[in-house]
Amino acid sequence: SYDSRTAQLRIERDCAGVQHTGGSFPAFSLFFAEGTEDEVFDAWFAALGCRPRTTRRLAGYSSWYNRYQNIDEASIQEDLNGCKTLFRAGDLFQIDDGWERKVGDWLEPDPAKFPNGLRPLADAAHESGFLAGLWLAPFVCEKESLLCKNHPDWLLQVDGQPWCCGCNWSSFYALDIDHPEVQAYLKQVFDSVLQDWGFDLVKLDFLYGAAPFGNARESRAGRMQRAMALLRSWCGDKLILGCGVPVMPAFGIVDYCRIGCDVGLDWDDVWYMRLFHRERVSTRQSIGNTIFRRQLNGRAYGSDPDVFFLREENCKLTLQQKQTLARVNAMFSGIL
């Protein structure tokens, strides 16, 4: 952090609890460079040995920002039919949260919503010329899920209690990525989604749940990077859009990565939410994230600034605000 009042730069590394057997070790490495913005960031990523997995720019559709969890087979098919009039071959058609029974129960879609499963919808997207994408949150499960009820030993424990990551859904808990049965389950999940159901891209959310803290063997950042490497090993060459993940542990591992907060259906949410934190749901904050993290795009991965809106219904953004959001996203992103 930089304190402009005192002209002091403070650098910290989160390695609380990590134990070393003795001898010397590097606390962290520093990189100093001068030049234009492009020269400096190109040199830094070269020193890191980091290159993006793809330079392909994606555009497409997500079910989340209009239907949210209120999706079913008919509504997804309706949206797919609409996308045929807007998008080009090779664009992305992505089904978001709401297809599963409960977060954590990934092996079968909700039969009440998707009685024919998801394979027919992935096939329909392919027949329309689109890539098929699907949302999951692999490192967490909600309290009411069958996974949580049947496998409490799979949950990451702190002082004998499961670690609660947040209050979404029925509240949700972190999975222990060191548990061999957790790893086997998640491999089975990705085999099903990517091979059996035929999806080309997975949007993986709430990834921070893998590493809420470090331990005696590894720092929090090291654990997060190891979790990301596990995801890549399970997904092979399929496309990954990472979400809810610290930006650096995802460098060079995911194809695309969210680099900021969610946009909202209005400019800056209600007043009391502005007292919360910077990464809250906010179109205004999202635009700032996209601008000030622009250097990651095309160097670490394709940056995902979140969506922009074309519709007029169910959206309180003015035309100027929608245009500003779309222009900033178009300038500094790898996925639209």
Predicted feature locations:
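Histidine/cysteine- and/or acidic
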Residues: 114, 118-122, 220-230
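Aromatic-lined carbohydrate-recognition surfaces of secreted/lumenal glycan-active proteins
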Residues: 63-65, 94, 130-143, 224-257
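Short glycine/threonine-rich loop-to-helix capping motif typified by GTGT followed
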Residues: 214-221, 254-255
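Short, well-ordered loop/turn elements at secondary-structure boundaries
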Residues: 55-56, 89, 127-129, 235, ...
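Glycan-recognition surfaces
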Residues: 148-184, 188, 229-336
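Aromatic-lined carbohydrate-binding/catalytic grooves of carbohydrate-active enzymes
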Residues: 58-61, 66-191, 195-214
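Generic alpha-helical structural element
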Residues: 65-72, 220, 316-320
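Carbohydrate-recognition beta-sandwich/jelly-roll modules
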Residues: 1-91
